């Protein structure tokens, strides 16, 4: 009898402890749910190489504490890999052009650089790259200065040569220093393919200011095979920030060299717009890589892209660049309204000219995005 009472007392204490733990868990869940309601989700989308991951890194630098020394050091192998990959692309591209072009001779490497090129191409094809040494830098610089490589570079849009090629080649000595720690500029130029989902929480007016909105920004893989992973992020998103690299109108995809990058961006933009879960979602379109766009327009006709085949040049210099930009902007506006059902026209749609590497411009742009979304929230609450 006493034993039974003792057991009942024990069970009663256990139940009380369990109930207390359950109540605590429920309380914390309720608190977290309330806190989550005040956090606005932003989904950062765009095709591969649109510059969206650079935007993501800028947010970390601008509205958080940036990268600590350990994080910076983690970029060393990434930057070294970028150097080797760029070198391989240029070397292999020159070989291909030398075999297929009428003016093949200008793509032929000098005798002394031929062996160097083969060695560096082999390194660039490995899964694990060696640390960048002074001797390897000497070889890379010799290859980079070869007239055949410089001629190949002029055909970079056909060969998947990254935008950061010049930056890397100009900083080889610094990258190979035994005491090298990447700068924030190095990190911004570093290219690492986004696979899966990464997120960051920030406030454009500073975490300590109570009036500031808090955002959670999600960056997802841009290549085609990554897009199926986006679905679980779609519901309940405050805004989609869509990055379009407007400078890539004459380039093809990394994963499908038959497909024009701008056409892929157009199709992706329209696909996202038509998703039912975005019917009330605000859209912020970043027409990115304007710095490269303004350099390219005078050299490469905009109608090199099928989508822009009706483009007609009207002038030269800055006036022509502005005309070209406004044409591209109008094309995206037309796509937006064609893909937006009549009952969705009240959702916010804004277009921003951006250069992901320009920190001041990115900061200004996100302040404008913040202002737009705050006004939208006030309007929906009936306060405007």
Curated annotation (Swiss-Prot):
A lipid is attached at residue 5 (S-palmitoyl cysteine). A lipid is attached at residue 2 (N-myristoyl glycine). Residues 284-291 are annotated as: G4 motif. Mg(2+) binds at residues 53, 194. Residues 38-384 form the G-alpha domain. Its cofactor is Mg(2+). It comes from the Eukaryota. GTP binds at residues 49-54, 163, 188, 194, 222, 288-289, 291, 356. Keywords: GTP-binding, Hydrolase, Lipoprotein, Magnesium, Metal-binding, Myristate, Nucleotide-binding, Palmitate, Transducer. The keyword Hydrolase applies. Residues 186-194 are annotated as: G2 motif. Residues 41-54 are annotated as: G1 motif. Residues 1-22 are annotated as: Disordered. GO terms for cellular component: cytoplasm; heterotrimeric G-protein complex. InterPro entries: Gprotein_alpha_su, GproteinA_insert, P-loop_NTPase, Plant_Gprotein_alpha. Pfam families: G-alpha (PF00503). Residues 215-224 are annotated as: G3 motif. Residues 354-359 are annotated as: G5 motif. G proteins are composed of 3 units; alpha, beta and gamma. The alpha chain contains the guanine nucleotide binding site. This is Guanine nucleotide-binding protein alpha-1 subunit. It comes from Solanum lycopersicum.
